[in-house]
């Protein structure tokens, strides 16, 4: 499994991408250096991604700050100590709160190893993650990208990526998930860097801030 560990890995991946697909060169020139955005694997990393889903970056960070315990990091055990209605105070949806509770229970019981899962091949890891109720392909893919450092993951169902790829490459219509997954094959084995590139395009050129993790 190719792993992204630092900014140099992102730069290397981008260099390879520009050789694989010259159409990306003007996009890369427009957006500048790509963000690393790595987080530690584990409950907090996955929880942050779930909190960030389908909300603006500012909203996600406000919710996340309210969730952080005063005396340390947000562990599965710490999450389970919150009172049952705490999700309302945090600003979470009930669905997200229920998903986080199920994940926290699995991690705390030892039945789910989120760090070890990152060491598995992408297909196997994605299968385990999406087997958790409330965790869909987007959440699983983004976790492997930003907490596992997997270099060859592309969340083709992400609407921001669909819009960005369609606009940046001058496509006649926004590509849907199946078409975008096929299109992204040319960017393997650095599809996670390609996703960073198009998310950066979405943020800087399309003036939107719904980027998966801060």
Model feature map: region roles:
Residues 4, 23, 27, 55-133:
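Alpha-helical ds-nucleic-acid-binding substructure associated with the helix-hairpin-helix region
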Residues 1-34, 98, 122-123, 137-214:
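C-terminal accessory module of base-excision DNA glycosylases/AP lyases that mediates lesion recognition
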Residues 47:
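Phosphate-handling catalytic interfaces
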Residues 41-42:
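Short, contiguous, helix-prone interaction/anchoring segments in small proteins
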